[in-house]
A protein has these predicted regions:
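Surface-exposed loop and membrane-interface regions of Gram-negative outer-membrane beta-barrel proteins
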Residues: 1-35, 46, 53-68, 147, ...
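Transmembrane beta-strands of outer-membrane beta-barrel pores
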Residues: 1-5, 41-43, 50-55, 92-96, ...
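Outer-membrane beta-barrel translocator domains and adjoining extracellular loop/strand segments
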Residues: 7-13, 58-66, 99-112, 116, ...
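Extracellular/periplasmic loop regions
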Residues: 9-25, 169, 173-225
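Residues that define the transmembrane beta-barrel architecture of outer-membrane proteins
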Residues: 28-33, 70-74, 117-121, 153-157, ...
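Residues on the lipid-exposed face of transmembrane beta-strands in outer-membrane beta-barrel proteins
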Residues: 34-39, 76-80, 123-127, 159-163, ...
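Repeated loop/turn-to-beta-strand initiation elements of outer-membrane beta-barrel proteins
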Residues: 43-47, 84-90, 131-137, 167-172, ...
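Surface-exposed extracellular loop regions of Gram-negative outer-membrane beta-barrel proteins
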Residues: 44-51, 152-191
Length: 225
């Protein structure tokens, strides 16, 4: 994909050095969005290469596709469907092509890297219990190397329940985040989500409550997504 601006850059795109302006994180540049090999079988699939990975509601793993430069992943993704309604997913990722790319090193910093290298493992198990209930358990082990000492690496484990009953949609989710790999911090952060929705004559109404918590102490921080 390609991102090009028209006119002067009177904003901070995170690459142009215009730090006196507000951030619009859509830097100029061109990059290969996807390049992959894919195998499909009636019981699952496997994908190798640069690819989109969008899990669940994309709160933790997704493409951030509303930005001009979509986030994609370099690695392998395997999905297995051994039973009706059950999907088991595993991904190994060695590089994240972030929304701050392409990686031409213009004012590139650890805070907004074009590429995030590392060794990450994503595990996701989703089961459609009944038409009104889907249950998803997951663990995302992110070993990220863009900060010295592994300060952004984390392990997130959670459970999500969602569905619709009598036209009312709902979602309940809890996750816990701790340090992982070489992260020297002592993380213990919680995530909560509750949503209710209803559609009236094609208009969707939704109310939600979301908490990204953090524990006390100098070695902790807020829940990261």
């Amino acid at each position: 994909d390609n991102v090009s601006r028209i006119g002067d850059a009177s904003y901070n795109e995170t690459r142009n050095g215009q730090s006196e302006y507000s951030v619009v994180a859509d830097p100029d540049g061109s990059e290969v969005n996807q390049a992959l090999l894919r195998y499909d079988h009636k019981y699952g699939s496997a994908v190798l290469g640069r690819q989109r990975i969008n899990l669940d509601n994309q709160r933790f793993v997704g493409g951030v596709a509303w930005r001009q430069n979509e986030q994609t992943y370099d690695g392998v993704l395997g999905q297995l469907k051994p039973l009706d309604g059950l999907t088991l997913s595993y991904a190994y990722i060695d590089n994240i092509n972030s929304i701050f790319g392409p990686g031409d090193n213009r004012f590139d910093t650890a805070a907004n890297p074009a590429n995030i290298e590392g060794h990450s493992h994503l595990l996701n198990a989703q089961y459609i219990v009944m038409p009104e209930l889907t249950a998803t358990a997951y663990q995302y082990r992110l070993g990220l190397d863009n900060l010295a000492g592994g300060g952004q690496s984390s392990k997130t484990t959670g459970l999500r329940l969602n569905g619709a009953i009598a036209g009312v949609s709902y979602a309940l989710e809890y996750a816990q985040q701790s340090e992982y790999a070489d992260n020297p911090l002592d993380l213990d952060s919680d995530y909560y989500l509750a949503e209710l929705g209803y559609t009236v004559q094609g208009v969707a109404l939704k109310a939600g409550y979301e908490v990204l918590g953090g524990d006390e102490g100098p070695g902790n921080r807020a829940f990261q997504t």
